[in-house]
C-alpha cells in the first residue's frame, strides 16, 4: 500500500474514534484547556497509582455537547477498552434514548462525565463506589469546557446525590419517580444495568411513564441541536 493511501486510512480511523473529542476539539483554545485539565488530573496525588500504571482518566467533554451523562465510574471493561458505556448497560441506555451506537459515539452531542474518571476496583458485591471528593475536584472545571449543555442525565444514586443535593428524595426510587420536578435541565434515572430488571419489574411505572418522557426530552435536545 502506498504511504499516502495508508495515512489516509489511518486518519479516517482516528476520526471515527469515540474519544476523539478528548484529543482533538474543534478550536485550539478548548483543546489547550482540555489537555491542561487532563494533565492536572493525572498529576493529582489521588490518581498517582493510575498514572503510574499508564491509565488515563476516562471521560468525554466535546465542546458542542448538548447532553451530559453523569454515572458512577468506569467499569473495568470501559477502562480497558477506553470506551464508555460499551456493554449491555450502554445498549439499554441508548435504547432508552432512542439513538444508535454510532450516533451516540460520533455525534459529539453526548458528554460522559462520571463521578470518578477511573475504575475504582472490585468490592464484595460489585464495583467499589467512586472515590470521595473526586467530583468536587474536577466536575466544575470539566463542565466549563461545555457551555451548551441542555440536559444532564443523572444515572444512579451517586450522581443524583451530588447534583440534586437537598432536592433529592428519600431514596433513588422516589427521586426517579419525581423526575418532573427536575426538568427541563436534569433527568434522574435508575442504572440501565440488566441487574436492575428486578427493580423495573417491581416498578412498572418506570418503563410505562418515565422512559417515554425521557426519550422525548432527549430527542427534543437532539432535534434542537440539528437546527
Explain the meaning of each model-derived region.
Residues 5, 9-11, 25:
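Acidic, Ala/Val/Gly-enriched low-complexity intrinsically disordered segments
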Residues 32-220:
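A polyanion-binding, active-site-adjacent surface
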Amino acid at each position: 500500500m502506498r504511504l499516502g493511501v495508508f495515512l489516509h486510512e489511518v486518519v479516517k480511523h482516528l476520526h471515527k474514534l469515540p474519544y476523539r473529542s478528548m484529543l482533538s476539539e474543534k478550536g485550539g483554545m478548548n483543546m489547550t484547556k482540555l489537555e491542561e485539565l487532563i494533565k492536572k488530573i493525572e498529576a493529582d496525588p489521588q490518581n498517582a497509582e493510575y498514572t503510574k500504571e499508564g491509565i488515563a482518566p476516562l471521560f468525554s467533554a466535546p465542546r458542542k455537547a448538548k447532553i451530559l451523562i453523569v454515572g458512577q465510574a468506569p467499569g473495568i471493561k470501559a477502562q480497558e477498552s477506553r470506551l464508555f458505556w460499551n456493554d449491555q448497560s450502554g445498549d439499554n441506555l441508548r435504547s432508552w434514548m432512542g439513538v444508535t451506537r454510532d450516533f451516540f459515539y460520533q455525534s459529539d452531542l453526548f458528554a460522559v462525565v462520571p463521578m470518578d474518571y477511573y475504575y475504582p476496583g472490585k468490592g464484595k458485591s460489585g464495583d467499589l463506589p467512586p472515590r470521595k471528593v473526586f467530583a468536587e475536584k474536577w466536575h466544575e472545571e470539566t463542565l466549563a469546557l461545555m457551555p451548551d449543555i441542555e440536559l444532564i442525565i443523572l444515572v444512579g444514586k451517586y450522581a443524583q446525590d451530588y447534583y440534586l443535593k437537598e432536592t433529592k428524595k428519600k431514596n433513588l426510587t422516589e427521586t426517579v419517580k419525581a423526575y418532573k420536578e427536575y426538568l427541563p435541565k436534569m433527568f434522574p434515572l435508575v442504572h440501565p444495568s440488566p441487574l436492575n430488571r428486578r427493580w423495573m419489574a417491581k416498578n412498572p411505572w418506570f418503563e410505562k411513564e418515565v422512559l417515554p418522557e425521557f426519550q422525548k426530552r432527549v430527542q427534543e435536545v437532539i432535534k434542537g441541536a440539528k437546527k
